[in-house]
Amino acid sequence: MSKEENAVFVGRRPTMNYVMATMMILNKGEECTVKARGRAISHAVDVCEILRNRFLKGTQYKDIKLATEQLEGENGQNNNVSSIEIVLAPPK
């Protein structure tokens, strides 16, 4: 599978939806990347922690990347938006 197919983009939906999507990818024995921007970053961290502590206890963090993206706002100004990518390795 490609890297984009193993990515879960966290947004406004309930946290457990993202936990289940991530769990399905990890159960195939593949790595999964949880991505989020802005206010959804805390939800992405929640997804990973719920997964590690309640469902797939052997899941490991493989990599965590933090970045800032510049987006053009409605008024034409550039806004800085934080983003996170958390790579999870399946349990052994």
Regions found by a protein language model. Give the residues of each.
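Beta-strand cores of modular interaction/reader domains in eukaryotic scaffold and signaling proteins
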Residues: 9, 33-35, 85-87
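Short glycine-rich, basic-tinged beta-strand/loop micro-motifs
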Residues: 26-42
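Short amphipathic alpha-helical interaction elements and helix-loop-helix interfaces
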Residues: 28, 32, 53-57, 92
